[in-house]
Each structure stands twice: as structure tokens, then as C-alpha cells.
């Protein structure tokens, strides 16, 4: 087991993930979301739960910094509370920080300002304190495949037996949080396609989405998206 995964297990993220799966499963599920519920039921399997931590969360928690350019470090070992701003209000992103709604939220910042770090902190706190199952994706790595297809691949990689219909059911259930990092890093020819998919996922399914981007990109000026700086 690599040191980052060992640290994640040590601080209790595995147990937190189990609790959030149980919390989501215990909600009142409408009949049309049966396929989505099946995905959550499978997440409670010990092997699949372990893979969610090792193959998904652990990967997202590994970071490189200026002082550690050749080795991965754990988010918690380097994180100092950062602040985001909106409408004259300063909001500190620290322990127990949550954004829980059905909106598209975009965190804007310069290169090196901490956007990706903040998004990873939101991922961590969502597992520890939230009521939705979070999935983290780096947009530059999935732009060719798209968000929904990439999410399906992540879920299938965990060993979950599912299909597109069940995934759509899960997305529409209100129990998923999508964390999409680096809109500005998408190739210019793919940006409008990815932005359209982000908007469609939110409008069709009501799924909560949090993105990051440098200023001046298409997502920063799109209507009905909440921007933080």
C-alpha cells in the first residue's frame, strides 16, 4: 500500500465513505431511481468500497508542489485554509466546509492560486461531512471521452455492474456531487462541448457540479453559473 493511501485510511476516510454510502442508501428513493440505488448498494461491498478509496479518492488526494515536485504528498499534510469570495463575502474553505445545492459553481483563480487544492479539500470534506457521493475528474484528461462517459468508466472500474440508464438514474437522484477540475486546461476546440455537457447534466438531472477555471474562459461568463474568486 502506498503512503498516501495508508494516510487516507489512517485518518478514517474509508469509514467516512462507508457512512456516506449508508446515508445515501437510507434516503427515500423514488421507484424510477432503482437503477441508481443499485449502484449505491454495490458501493457498500467491502471490495468496491476499498476500490473507491484506493482507485479514486487516493488518486485525487495525491498532489505535487513546488517543494515536492518529484514526490506525491497528501492534501492534508500541506493544506492551509484558503478563502473564496463572492458578492463581498469571504468564505474560508476549512474543515467541515460544504457547498450543498443543485447548482453549477465555478471557482476562478490565477495559476497557482489554489483552485485545484480547494476542489480537493471540498472532495475530502464532502466524504467526511456531506450527504452526496463525490466524484473527482480532471477535465483535461477526459475531454475526448466526455464527463458522463468518464463517470461511467470510473464506476465500472470499481467493479460495479451498471449501465448508462442506471447512471442517469443515479445522477437524477440528487445524491451525486461532480467535482471537475481545470476547465481552462481543456483544449480550445473542446471547451464548448464540455461546457454544454456540464450545463446539460445540471439541467437534465439537477446534479450538483463544482468546477475550477482560470478567469476569462467560457464557463466564467456563462449565465446561471455561480462564480467564486
Residue ranges and their predicted role:
Residues 2-44, 48-229:
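P-loop NTPase signaling cores
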Amino acid at each position: 500500500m502506498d503512503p498516501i493511501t495508508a494516510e487516507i485510511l489512517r485518518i478514517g476516510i474509508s469509514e467516512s465513505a462507508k457512512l456516506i454510502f449508508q446515508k445515501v442508501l437510507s434516503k427515500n428513493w423514488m421507484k424510477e431511481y432503482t437503477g441508481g440505488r443499485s449502484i449505491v448498494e454495490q458501493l457498500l461491498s467491502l471490495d468496491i468500497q476499498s476500490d473507491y478509496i484506493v482507485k479514486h479518492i487516493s488518486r485525487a488526494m495525491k498532489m505535487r508542489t513546488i517543494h515536492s515536485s518529484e514526490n506525491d504528498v497528501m492534501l492534508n499534510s500541506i493544506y492551509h485554509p484558503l478563502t473564496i469570495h463572492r458578492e463581498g463575502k469571504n468564505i474560508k474553505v476549512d474543515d467541515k466546509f460544504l457547498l450543498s445545492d443543485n447548482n453549477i459553481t465555478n471557482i476562478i483563480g490565477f495559476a497557482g492560486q489554489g483552485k485545484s487544492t480547494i476542489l480537493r479539500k471540498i472532495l475530502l470534506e464532502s466524504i467526511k461531512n456531506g450527504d452526496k457521493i463525490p466524484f473527482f475528474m480532471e477535465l483535461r484528461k477526459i475531454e475526448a471521452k466526455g464527463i458522463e462517459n468518464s463517470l461511467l468508466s470510473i464506476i465500472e472500474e470499481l467493479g460495479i455492474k451498471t449501465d448508462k440508464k442506471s447512471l442517469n438514474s443515479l445522477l437524477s437522484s440528487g445524491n451525486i456531487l461532480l467535482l471537475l477540475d481545470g476547465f481552462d486546461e481543456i483544449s480550445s476546440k473542446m471547451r464548448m462541448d464540455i461546457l454544454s455537457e456540464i450545463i446539460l447534466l445540471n439541467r437534465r438531472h439537477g446534479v450538483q457540479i463544482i468546477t475550477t477555471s482560470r478567469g476569462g474562459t467560457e464557463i466564467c461568463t456563462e449565465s446561471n453559473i455561480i462564480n467564486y474568486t
